[in-house]
Amino acid sequence: MTITARPRETELLAAATRLFRERGFHATSMQDLAEALGMNRGSLYHYITSKDELLWSVLNRSFDLLDERVAPQLDADAPPLERLRSAIHEHLRVAADHADELSLIQIELRSLSPERRRQMIERRDAYEHRWRRAIADGIANGELRSVDVRLAGIGILSVCNWFTQWYRPNGELTVDEVADAFVGLFLGGMQPWGKAPETDR
């Protein structure tokens, strides 16, 4: 299945994303997917060859969203601290807009077949590398203290990725308020003593 899908394929991706998050990949059957779409199970195979292919398509779409919206913030021609601040905000906005898709990266990537899992791990690693590069650039130009780049990247992304598990749009905080708090906690903690990062507010 291609990511630029026809309407019926788009409906299938949406149904699979919802059911995989609600029930888990292994507990969701092809019959469940067919019933969610109001079609016969056999008709699903006009669009996909297997459930594994469907999960792969969903995860590919998740990484496409991050590459389209967050990667440009990290790769921008701007000071490293500004790149990181903007990327935290945009990652959380993507997570809020596409919570089901992004949560599946964390909980179902391991469910893919070995070759497809390898492909997704490569995409995940490439995305994480962008964050580490921005952190390293910040250390190099003096905006950030000399910290362990790998651990700093893991810390920021772990908290940003877990956001999909607890954030509620009708809760007390807006997405940008949460992002500002994360900027203060992480970027503030990595800056030279006595400095504080700017927020979007």
For each predicted feature, which ranges?
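Amphipathic alpha-helical packing segments from all-alpha helical-bundle domains
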Residues: 64-67, 115-140, 150-154, 177
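Hydrophobic alpha-helical connector segments
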Residues: 57, 71-100, 152-156
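Short, solvent-exposed amphipathic helices
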Residues: 61, 72, 90, 100-104, ...
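N-terminal intrinsically disordered/low-complexity leader segments
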Residues: 1-7, 14, 194-201
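C-terminal peripheral helix-coil segments that are non-catalytic and often amphipathic
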Residues: 90-93, 97, 129-140, 159, ...
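Helix-turn-helix
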Residues: 11, 15, 19-53, 57
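Short, hydrophobic secondary-structure boundary micro-motifs
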Residues: 103-106, 147, 197-199
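Amphipathic alpha-helical segments used for helix-helix packing
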Residues: 83, 96-115, 165
